[in-house]
Amino acid sequence: MQNSKKVIVGISGGVDSSVCALMLKTAGFDVQGVFMKNWTNSAPNIECTTEKDFADAEAVCDQIGIPLHQANFSGDYWDRVFKKFLSDHNEGLTPNPDILCNKEIKFRSFLDYCLEIGADYIATGHYVRVDNSGSSARLLRGIDPTKDQSYFLHQVTGKDLAKSLFPLGELTKEQVRQIAKDNKLITSEKKDSVGICFIGKNKYNDFIANFLGKDPGVILDEEGNELGVHDGLMYFTLGQRQGIGLGGIKGKEQDSWYVAHKDTQSKALTVVQGRDHPLLFSDGCYVDNVQWVNENNEDELNCEVQIRYQSQPVKALLKKLTDGYKIIFASPQLAVTPGQSAVIYKGDDCLGGSVIKDRISSDFYSWADNRGYNYQVYG
């Protein structure tokens, strides 16, 4: 039965968006595809897969029998996503640009573009669900816990979710692959893209070095002993083990080194040994004002919080402050990282989230006081 509703699918050239488009066409929707160009290829020494992905998108849309258009949002991406990505790194943060890309590009630039050309809905291959049974659309986890992407969509409003379709949210990745194989889609065996979209196959630090250069400082142990030098705090994140470059220090060979603190004033990088070191754990965190999927006026909320993609959610208490919120975890969490997002859940219901401003840790505060490092406690 033909459905008169027009749906525009974001086609990336991967298996997920391919199956998304196929399922909607099979359901009778009037389906068209749009390939989004969000990144410019002009940056030096950077390998980009846009041309290959577009060729795959064209081929799979031909197979499915839907038209494919191109839309160039690279200017929006540069101004609203990438510039902030670089400035956050310069401030010693560890940003997650994919979250901002969803908010600013896929559910702003792309959504506006599609509505302007007559779409009733947009659709993407994200593994999430939307519940439209109430007065406002709710964002729910996808049923496949290994692929759930609600963490990345927590800044999308209920108003915009109501205009969005996510058919893969009810499927596992294995089922999606099988649908692609059963229909002989050319993307059925294509590997999933991993990591940040614009970095592609490039090494993370090599990529950002093209834009940020070097800002060297010293590497210290927790007592303040100098162990080496680094090229810039922006190349490290809290809890990081690989790439510190401290192998073979005499008398300290027994355990791996982990990043425990980045001091932006002195440019010192403090590292500790052992993944269970107290300086790596936090009792909670401070976040900016929460971006709620739907309006929430509670000053306190018992919830679950997820502090990185695919990490286990932890029970927590969210408390409103004069400037943002405080989150207290039910148990200490490893590598709570400023710049990353703390996303708030009630079961499968994703309520919203915010960027982590700072950690809450009595062990860290005592150590910082002894070392003379500044930190902020919000009230």
Where are these regions (language model features)?
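ATP-dependent adenylation/nucleotidyltransferase module used to activate substrates
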Residues: M1-H154, L165, E174, V259, ...
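AMP-forming adenylation/ATP pyrophosphatase catalytic core
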Residues: S12, N41, A123-G379
